[in-house]
Amino acid sequence: MIKLTEKIGYGFGDMASSMFWKLFGAYLMIFYTDVFGLPAAAVGTMFLITRIWDSVFDPIVGVAADRTQTRWGKFRPYLLWLAIPFAAIGVLTFMTPSFGQTGNLIYAYITYSLMMMVYSAINVPYASLHGVMSPLPQDRNTLSTYRMVFAYIGSFIALLLFMPMVRFFSGNSDELADQQHGWTMAIVVIAILCAILFYGCFAWTKERVKPIKEQQGSLKDDLRDLLHNKPWWILLGAGVSALVFNSIRDGATVYYFKYFIIEEAYANVSLFGVSFVLSGLYLAVGQAANIVGVILAAPLSNQIGKKRTYMGSMLIASVLSILFFWLDKTDLALIFTFQVFISICAGSIFPLLWSMYADCTDYSELKTGNRATGLIFSSSSMSQKFGWAIGTAITGWLLAFFGFQANTVQSEETISGIKMFLSFLPAVGTILSVVFIAFYPLSETKMKEITATLETKRKETNE
């Protein structure tokens, strides 16, 4: 039985990761186009190129983590070693040097690539930790819930407070230089908090599950085993598709409110002396609704199974996303209502995915004798990165295709394109995700059989 403090400690890790992840997803595109002055198409291409490399880098980290041996375990040490680099490179990513447009684009390539690599280097071991904290599927389901609740709490805090901090540090000035300073200082605050949370995760967690045999196989053997793991392939496709859905919606939200809703025409909402813009509230409401989805995932999956819960949630999100296109700019109540229900559906699927990845490690151990926890969980990060890369690249390219020009009034064609980013395009991702998960073979009954068999083998090995 895992103690409450350890569950909370594990949640701290994804709280830290998600603060940066959501800020990148929601604000990095518009930061590059409207604050740093880079062309939208160039940014889209950069996202795709850097994320493709980063997706390849994830399994390298997973293999290295599987072979790491320290007094702290295989995966926890990475939280200790990389918390500060994670924070520091995050700050560099949101800095705005003056190297000319070509030089600035090169700077963006370098800092963004480094950021995604250090994200992988800390997040892949963190995700893998989930698979070795307990051998019991019910414990891992609980850990998935804690992980995602804290992830969405972190996202909620970051999305709610980031733009108010930008305005505070910029002195409420609209001058570009002041805005650039505000963005950098706001990310400094978030980065410090992320480092503290990673240290908390390291201190409060413990690795318990040992493989039946120590890691002796070669990288070639590990990759061969992975490529023959059918559930892994299915989850990879489902994860990529789900992240395309999320990344397009998140990346286009600020454009939607800035250029279609014209949020400047509305008075900012003030709470406790802090002023919030509509786009920030919209994103934060989505994160709060995600938490509801996470909480509902466990009881729903216990009743009808993980697979049915996942498919049902994504199908509902598909229908609501398509209907979103026809909402008018004056339908703010409906826009926020749709955001709540779409986000509840989106929130419910990710704890299910993490739990399914943990099941894949058991399946791998049963079939090959090799858990390859880090390598398998690296695919979860890989699917995140690759799905996000595809989604943001599509956003950048289509913004250019529809004639987007930063900080000007947009044409009707551009506005129609921006509306598609929150409707038809995300729906494609949800539908593809449902198609993939329909073929997932590890039912609850099957996993009980696998768990019992592995427990017997572990006892025999330890005798």
Predicted segments with their positions:
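Membrane-embedded alpha-helical bundles of multi-pass transporters/translocases
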Residues: M1-E463
